[in-house]
Amino acid sequence: FYVNTPSGIRVYVYGTRFNVSAYESEDYVETVLESGHVSVFMPVYGTSETLNPGERLLFDKKALQFMKSKVDVSEKTAWKDGKLIFRNTSLDEMLKRLSRHFNVDIHFNNKSGKNYTFRATFRNESLFQILDYLSKSVSMKWNVEDPVQLSDGTFTKRKVIVDLY
């Protein structure tokens, strides 16, 4: 079978364990292979790359280039087992992943915090427990804004505002 991403990348899958991360708001499409075999194809340009287990392929949507590297697969696929693993991860990237994992909008007001990196593994902690742990490592405070009901009866996502001080 194959997976089509919004940016036009097609990932052909052959009896594998893999992860594709393809968010519209991100500059990269990431494919990580745990086992088996995948081919990543960009139909518009006729370009393809093949991955071996333990490899990651990033497609830079701006430069239109593939970049292949070795990767700690467990960090990229642990979410499937209910774990979040961060290895040398910036605070900004960590908050993006937490936002996706917990389906909340996290607004990080102080981009100067990109200099902070973390190494952590979370198994069953709630978002608020994780934010409490982070605030013990970094001078950080956070506030939660409840969802707002829209005119059509639906609700916005819960919003979490993170500030460094």
Roles of regions detected by a PLM:
Residues 1-63:
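Short, small/hydrophobic-biased targeting/export segments
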Residues 64-165:
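N-terminal export/assembly leaders
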